[in-house]
Amino acid sequence: MKVRAAAVAIWVAVGLVGTAVSAHAADGDAKRGKVLAYTCHGCHGVPDYKNAFPNYSVPKLGGQNAQYLINALNGYAGGDRPHQTMHATASTLSEQDRADITAFLQAEVVQPSKQVVGTPPPTTQTCVSCHGSDGAKTIGPEYPILAGQHPDYIVHALEDYKSGKRKNPIMAGIVAGVDAKDFEAIAEFFGQQHGLCSTDELRKHDKCVRDSE
């Protein structure tokens, strides 16, 4: 895979100032958010639940960076992320609702593993600067944790960035020269790392539990 130097330069430069342009919300109340998050649990807490069309796994939200989730909800509400169900749901939530729900979902933010699982494919070199070597240590809270996410969801997200369905100029530049085979390799690697969990696990333990716990 060839990634254009200009795209990488833009990615790094904008990434370093990403925090300044993120849409921050009020401090969240995780206790209230746990109640409000029942609306999320119906899809994101069901094992093996998939979006109908196109077909892909509904993403894991447990342990995800709260600021990233707030930005995602804002994107769904505003139409920058096209998804009818999520648009309808996000549009009903106030700024405080979003802050509370995401505070609960973040719980204890996923921490990097002491040892990376497997050998990272060369294509992940374009991901680690922002998402970390195992996808669990992001350079800022507005970037998503990838570790433990469903591989097919990661592929779907990358495809949407490439097609422009998800409006993000940074990611659009990064994935422009990446093919489907590379998408799958990236997704499989990050998906097998310790990381995110379903809202069902989060409700039971108030955090994403490691296999050894």
For each predicted feature, which ranges?
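Sec/Tat signal peptide C-region and signal peptidase I cleavage site
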Residues: 19-25
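N-terminal secretory signal peptides that target proteins for export/translocation
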Residues: 1-4
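Short N-terminal segments immediately surrounding and downstream of signal-peptide cleavage
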Residues: 25-43, 202-212
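Inter-heme linker and motif-flanking segments adjacent to c-type heme-binding CXXCH motifs
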Residues: 47-53, 80-82, 107-118, 133-145, ...
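Gly/Gly-Pro-rich "capping" loops immediately C-terminal to redox-active cysteine motifs
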Residues: 34, 47-76, 87-92, 128, ...
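The canonical Cys-X-X-Cys-His
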Residues: 33, 38-46, 101, 124-133, ...
